[in-house]
C-alpha cells in the first residue's frame, strides 16, 4: 500500500521598506561613573561639539562643575577654579602626564584646540599619588585624538562676525594592524579691535596662533608605545584701542604684547607582564621648552622654562580584591627670567632657578565588589630647594544601593611658588 501526503510550501516575503519612528540626536552631558573611587567627571566629544569653535578654556562653558574666568582680561589670561581656589592649585595633565605648568599656566587654556580633544577628565579634591604632589583642589586630564582611531582626514573652518577665524585639520593613517600615525593642525586668527563698552580698552586681545601635533602609536598584545611631538607659536596684543576717540595721535597708548614659542615631546610605553593579574610596567617621558617675551606697558618680562619629566610605574592585582601600584618619578625645571620694570633701565634683572625633584610613591586599592573601594596612597619627594616632604592621600567610595554613592577624599598637596612665572 502506498500512502502519500500533500506537502505545501509557504512563501515568505521581506518588505523593501520599513518606516522608523522619529529619532532625535542630542549631545550628551558629562559622564560621572559610580564605579570610580575619585569624584571625576568625563566630558566627551558629545559635549565638546556643542561649541562651534572652542579651546580647552571655552569647552567648560557648557559644564557648570568647572568655573573658568579671566585672571587678566587685557592679555586674555584665564584660570580654572575648583572648590573655590584659583588654577594654580589645579593640576593639569595631558594623557596622565603633568603638563602646562609654571610659565605656561596663564595662557594654557588657549593652547589646546577643541577639535584635538577626545575627552576631558575633571577630578575634584585630592587626586591619586601616581600623578605627583601638585594636585590640591583638583585635577584636569586631557586625552587627545589617538592615531589608532578613525582612519582618514577631517577638516573644519569657523569664522564669526568679528572675523575671528579658526582652521582645523587632522588626519591619521593605519600603516598596518599595529602601527599608525596622525597629524593635527590648528590655525587661529583674530585681528579686529573689540571694545563693546567703549572704555578705550580692547575687551579681548588680538590673537594669532599656529599649533601642530604629530603622533605615532604602536599597539600589540603585550606592548603599547605612543610618541607625541608638538610645536606652538602664539601672539597676543591687547591694551588701549587705537580707534579710541579720546586718544590723540601724540598720546602713547597702553599696550600689552605676549609672544610665545613652545615645543613638547612625550613618549609613553606600557608592557603587559601577566594579563591574568593585570600585571604591567610603564615608562613615561616628557620634555618641554617654553619661551615667552612679554611687554605690559613699559614693563618687560621674558621667561624661558625647560622641563623634563620621567616616571616608572609597576602595577598588579594581588588577588581579585587587592591591587598595588608603586613607582618612581623625576621632575626637573630650569627657569631663566629677565625683568625690567620700566623698560628703559640699562640693566635688566635676571634670575635663574633650577629645581630637581625625585619621588617615590605606593598606592593600595581594596575593592569589595561594587559596594566599597578604599584607596590609600603615600608619596615621598625631595626638592633641592625645599627639602623632603610626604604626601599622604586617602580615597573611599561606598555605594549602599544602585542610586546612592558616597565619596570622600583626604590628602595634602604642594607646589613650588614662582613670583612671576
What are the language-model segments listed below?
Residues 10-49, 57, 87:
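Short, acidic, small-residue-rich periplasmic hinge/interaction motif at the N-terminus
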Residues 57-98:
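Extracytoplasmic beta-strand/coil segments of soluble accessory domains associated
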Residues 79, 97-124, 212:
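Short acidic/polar hinge/loop motifs at secondary-structure boundaries
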Residues 111-152:
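A beta-strand signature from Gram-negative outer-membrane beta-barrel systems
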Residues 151, 178-181, 191, 222-225, ...:
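Repeated loop/turn-to-beta-strand initiation elements of outer-membrane beta-barrel proteins
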Residues 190-213, 217-278, 287-305:
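Flexible loop and strand-edge segments within Gram-negative outer membrane beta-barrel domains
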Residues 244-246, 336-339, 384-389, 396-398, ...:
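Surface-exposed extracellular loop regions of Gram-negative outer-membrane beta-barrel proteins
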Residues 252-275, 281, 285-375, 410:
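Outer-membrane beta-barrel transmembrane domain signature of Gram-negative proteins
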Amino acid at each position: 500500500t502506498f500512502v502519500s501526503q500533500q506537502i505545501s510550501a509557504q512563501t515568505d516575503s521581506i518588505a523593501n521598506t520599513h518606516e522608523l519612528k522619529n529619532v532625535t540626536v542630542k549631545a550628551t552631558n558629562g559622564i560621572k561613573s559610580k564605579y570610580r573611587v575619585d569624584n571625576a567627571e568625563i566630558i566627551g566629544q558629545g559635549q565638546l561639539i556643542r561649541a562651534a569653535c572652542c579651546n580647552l578654556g571655552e569647552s567648560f562653558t557648557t559644564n557648570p562643575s568647572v568655573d573658568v574666568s579671566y585672571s587678566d582680561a587685557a592679555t586674555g589670561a584665564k584660570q580654572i577654579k575648583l572648590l573655590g581656589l584659583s588654577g594654580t592649585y589645579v593640576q593639569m595633565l595631558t594623557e596622565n602626564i603633568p603638563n602646562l605648568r609654571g610659565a605656561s599656566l596663564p595662557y594654557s587654556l588657549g593652547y589646546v584646540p577643541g577639535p584635538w580633544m577626545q575627552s576631558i577628565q575633571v577630578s575634584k579634591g585630592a587626586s591619586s599619588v601616581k600623578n605627583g604632589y601638585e594636585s590640591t583642589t583638583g585635577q584636569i586630564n586631557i586625552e587627545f585624538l589617538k592615531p589608532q582611531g578613525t582612519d582618514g582626514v577631517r577638516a573644519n573652518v569657523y569664522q564669526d562676525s568679528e572675523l575671528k577665524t579658526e582652521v582645523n585639520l587632522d588626519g591619521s593613517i593605519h600603516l598596518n594592524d599595529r602601527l599608525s600615525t596622525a597629524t593635527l593642525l590648528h590655525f587661529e586668527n583674530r585681528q579686529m579691535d573689540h571694545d563693546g563698552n567703549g572704555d578705550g580698552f580692547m575687551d579681548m586681545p588680538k590673537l594669532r596662533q599656529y599649533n601642530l601635533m604629530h603622533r605615532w602609536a604602536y599597539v600589540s598584545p603585550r606592548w603599547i608605545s605612543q610618541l607625541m611631538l608638538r610645536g606652538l607659536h602664539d601672539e597676543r596684543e591687547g591694551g588701549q584701542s587705537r580707534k579710541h576717540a579720546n586718544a590723540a595721535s601724540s598720546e602713547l597708548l597702553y599696550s600689552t604684547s605676549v609672544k610665545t614659542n613652545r615645543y613638547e615631546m612625550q613618549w609613553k610605553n606600557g608592557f603587559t607582564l601577566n594579563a591574568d593579574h593585570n600585571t604591567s610596567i610603564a615608562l613615561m617621558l616628557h620634555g618641554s621648552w617654553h619661551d615667552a617675551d612679554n611687554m605690559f606697558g613699559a614693563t618687560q618680562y621674558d621667561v624661558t622654562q625647560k622641563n623634563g619629566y620621567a616616571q616608572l610605574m609597576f602595577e598588579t592585582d594581588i588577588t581579585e580584591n587587592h591591587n598595588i601600584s608603586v613607582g618612581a618619578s623625576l621632575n626637573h625645571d630650569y627657569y631663566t627670567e629677565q625683568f625690567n620694570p620700566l623698560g628703559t633701565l640699562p640693566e635688566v634683572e635676571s634670575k635663574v632657578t633650577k629645581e630637581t625633584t625625585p619621588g617615590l610613591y605606593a598606592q593600595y586599592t581594596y575593592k569589595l565588589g561594587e559596594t566599597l573601594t578604599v584607596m590609600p596612597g603615600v608619596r615621598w619627594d625631595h626638592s633641592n630647594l625645599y627639602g623632603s616632604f610626604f604626601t599622604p592621600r586617602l580615597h573611599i567610595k561606598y555605594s549602599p544601593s544602585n542610586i546612592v554613592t558616597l565619596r570622600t577624599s583626604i590628602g595634602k598637596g604642594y607646589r613650588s611658588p614662582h613670583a612671576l612665572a
